[in-house]
Amino acid sequence: MSRMAPPTGQHATTSTVILRPADQRFHSQLDWLDSWHSFSFGSHQDPNWMGFGPLRVINDDTIAAGQGFGMHPHRDMEIITVMVEGALSHADSMGNSAVLHAGEVQRMSAGSGIVHSEINQT
């Protein structure tokens, strides 16, 4: 079996998956938001938990009814929202709007920049 070298200027990398128990994740709590962070996020920074390859954020957010994230910017990233329960309204600066329901998934490409909001509709 032969192994191909990576293209010039790229490096071959291997990553080891490390199981991180839920009770060892970072936790943030506000009046309207209960959030568990698998990697360093916001004020929770640990150089040993910066992400996995290009993946930088996995947050498990519970948002109070009628509350959420007002319009805020992102760029140069893909954002995946997986709805476990409830309904979440999404609106963005590209004119897109939708309500996501339990069991649905949304992918948003921030590319050169986008502004969006996410509000719990339940």
Language-model features and meaning:
Residues 92-109:
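Short acidic-glycine-tyrosine-enriched beta hairpin
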Residues 72-74, 90, 116-117:
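Histidine-centered active-site/metal-ligand motif
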Residues 62, 86-90, 105-106:
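Short beta-strand segments in beta-sandwich/barrel cores
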Residues 24-79, 84:
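A short glycine-rich, His/Asp/Glu-containing loop-to-beta-strand
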Residues 69-70, 94-96, 119-121:
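Catalytic micro-motifs at enzyme active sites that drive phosphoryl/nucleotidyl and oxygen chemistry
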Residues 108-122:
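Hydrophobic, well-structured mid-protein blocks that either form specific transmembrane helices
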Residues 1-20:
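Basic/polar N-terminal segments that are highly enriched at the extreme N-terminus
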